[in-house]
């Protein structure tokens, strides 16, 4: 038990903090003495500071396990409960508070104070126990009535708010959706009420306040069908704010006080002339009166026009025929604000003298409006002639009427370069008003062009040629824009003529403008037709294999089959032409192989049942097709004079013919075929049917050997067969051949008399 007063404990604590800081204050004796029990109240309160007990201070603290943390409210008084609570909080903080509800109970038992074990001497403990016994007042049990006096509920806002708060503290937000009737409010206030007591309170409330205390549960009131049919008359209901027109032509809005057929007693004075403000519409007199009444009162607010054209509204104060004495000064010119209308001056004076306006409107030379006091030159003012005809820089504040000769200087100019580009900004070119900038004004400079072509037209006799564009624009054969450094054929560069007018496979890097400028019309049309635009699945090329074709027996494939789709084309051009009426692209195929000479049906193996099925459906889904022949035997699909394999290798049926026989047959075919018809393609698959093949820069010709033609058929068979399948070896070509017209640049030179190179046969001089 502490024997020090609170003042002594505070002084010791402050001294310890000044010497060692906050950590020293935690281990000081004053901190231990701050834990006080219920017995310290009487001892410290009875002993004054003048009469100190000369006892040694207790150095041992009360053990924490001996402190009664849990104390019931039924055994301690409110004062002792407060002391125990504060003592527990000073030792363990807020975690020592374990009481869930601080509401006191109605019945209290005898006060029993827990004994606090102290470590003081027995004599001091005995003295303190005597003091506690003398000062302790034993309270007897007081019997209270459990059933309190019933208080009638009154449906006031305070009771509703209290009940709502209590319900929300228990049930949360869901309590706001509960019923708010008188019975529910009574049950919330006292949950222990019986149904008989609740009904008594409700009847008592209704006897005082009537049926106004009845409240639903927030739902809509029940309503049945409208038997009277008032909903049909909603369109004919009267509007709260009406609109009518007076006899003078003005519009009046608001609550209509007009005569109505549904109202009796307002017939009197309907058709009479009434003085004052007219608040009845003209439609009333037209409906109920035979003769329209004449209103003799003048219009309070009139609208007149001044000599400058401005409108003036308000009380008209001009000259009148009904007023005498206002004739003097009618036709005189007055200074100041004009409040007399121009109509009055024209009526009595015969002419209207236009007066100058304070605020004027004008238009600049650029078409912008300027309003305000125009400080332009006037014939009535002398001394403003100086500089009136000169051209000024800056913002234009004069109108178009007093504008000087010429146009004012613009801050931001617009110029055109030699290439046709537009340049805006402050002009830095040559000017008549600046001297010293003549040098080099007519010379052609390299670099960015920031001077407009107007300077050359004004100061120089001729316009220089524009420089080559750094970034050019061209149009590819597939209608795509190509921008960047132009790598096509140029008139300034020599040696780029070969191959410029030939069809190349791969990505086009030269535009159509190069073809139109350097090639003839026939070659240009040929190159354009071979490089058709393929949009989506609308490709001109035939496709073989497992493909979702259109036009067959499969249902559901016709939807969207004739539309342009993006992505990889999976429908051939032949299917597109046969099923769609108007294909979006050219009907010519990319691979110039005619169906007459190379039929697609020649490359398939069909059984009799298959042929019968193909006669019924010729546009179905295709698969791996082989040569159409009934002589194919063996496990490797080999036949007489044929080599099977992929579709990229097609060979002539007669390979046992000699070279001369083949040449004669080709000449006879060339005579029969017209010149416009092009020979069938020798390259199938990914390559084009004619033209140059990019890559290692080799050209196709009649005198050049390579990976195609008769020699290729001998040297590169797809599969090695038996000896009977190989044709005999033909004699080598040793006849004199004509020299080609084209030149091949590189190691062979660049002149026409230079060496001619064939890729398979080596160099030839």
UniProtKB/Swiss-Prot annotation:
What InterPro entries would the database entry show?
Answer: CSOS2/2B
Principal subcellular localisation of the protein: other
For the region Disordered, what residue ranges are annotated?
1-107, 165-229, 306-328, 367-413, 611-637, 656-765
Give positions of region: N-terminal domain: 1-215
Spans of biased composition, class Polar residues? 38-63
Q: Which residue intervals correspond to the N-repeat repeats?
A: 7-22, 79-94, 158-173, 196-211
Question: Can you state the subunit structure given in the record?
Answer: Probably interacts with the carboxysome major shell protein CsoS1 via the N-terminal domain. A CsoS1-CsoS1D-CsoS2 complex can be isolated following expression in E.coli. Interacts via its N-terminal repeats with RuBisCO.
What is the protein name stated in its UniProt record?
Answer: Carboxysome assembly protein CsoS2
Q: Which organism is it from?
A: Prochlorococcus marinus subsp. pastoris (strain CCMP1986 / NIES-2087 / MED4)
